[in-house]
């Protein structure tokens, strides 16, 4: 790592702490040449291959997950912080798997699990895009499963 101020390569770590809100390690560093101090965050790199519907493999991209969550939760009570928290939870679930290969179907099911707990409108919006309903009957099944005992919610 280079100092962002003078590009010198010799740094010393002054302080190191867990940053639990972002599953990262926060480090305070000092450049040994210019004595400037700065903060860095270290996170685990997720090396998971995603199997796409067409059979291709692609590296997992958290930004795609966050964008999908944002689209589903637009104009709902889910805020940016909760979107990030859900994405972080899903990422942790993926890291916990033994297999470093996951299908888009498995990722979609994880998203649905977390959105169902967070906000029903976001859950249904995501389900409409993710499940690619062919008719209204399929949508009705999701709507009925989203409410307790299939009852109407007001």
Curated annotation (Swiss-Prot):
Q: Name one GO biological process term.
A: negative regulation of DNA-templated transcription
> Which keywords label this protein?
ATP-binding, DNA-binding, Metal-binding, Nucleotide-binding, Repressor, Transcription, Transcription regulation, Zinc, Zinc-finger
Domain of life, per lineage:
Bacteria
Q: How is the cofactor bound?
A: Binds 1 zinc ion.
Which residues does the UniProt record annotate as the domain ATP-cone? 48-138
InterPro entries for the chain: ATP-cone_dom, NrdR-like_N, RNR_NrdR-like
Which residues belong to zinc fingers classed as unnamed? 3-34
The cofactors named for this UniProt entry are: Zn(2+)
Q: Which GO terms describe its molecular function?
A: ATP binding; double-stranded DNA binding; zinc ion binding
Which PROSITE patterns does the record associate with it? Answer: ATP_CONE
PANTHER family with a match to the protein in the record: TRANSCRIPTIONAL REPRESSOR NRDR (PTHR30455:SF2)
Record's function text: Negatively regulates transcription of bacterial ribonucleotide reductase nrd genes and operons by binding to NrdR-boxes.
- Family statement: Belongs to the NrdR family.
HAMAP family tied to this protein = NrdR (MF_00440)
Q: Mind telling me what this protein is named?
A: Transcriptional repressor NrdR
Gene coding for it:
nrdR
